[in-house]
Amino acid sequence: MPFQIPSTWAWCSHNDVLEISGGSQPAKRFFSSVPQKGYVRLYQIRDYGENPIPVYIPIEYAMKQTEEGDILLARYGGSLGKVFHAQKGAYNVAMAKVIFKDKDLIKKEYAYFYYLSDLYQGRLKEISRTAQAGFNSSDFNEMYFPLPPYEEQQRIVNAINEAFTTIDAIAKNL
């Protein structure tokens, strides 16, 4: 196991508790830069940055969709390892959506912080072995997920959020 955890926690295989679902997209001829009836926003990694470029696709081609607040992971290249809170819409092939196998087992924000952690990010560096670095769901078979009791997950999330608030306040005063 990566490190010692409290006796009330459990080490789980990532894929036993979470699933990764890669995105999809139709051919570019179906892309529109203007929203219209029967279309949905197709989110790409660039849309979660400072200069989004909206693209819309017919709803019937939106095979992979997210709800607001879902967790998306960047899968390839220079964005590999970035973690996003999704907007409602479709997501493209450069991203993967995190699916919770049991919604009452893991708090979404706890999982979000897990994907930002060295435990995930370090393993991701190990498995991305090509020039166009990337991952697929089977790469997560040997990845571990530390699972505290549900209530403790919220305490961890609160502590992390409090730390970020403090860091932001300090940075603002520099």
Where are these regions (language model features)?
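Short, surface-exposed loop/turn microsegments at beta-strand edges and helix-strand junctions
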Residues: 31-40, 58-67, 82-94, 104, ...
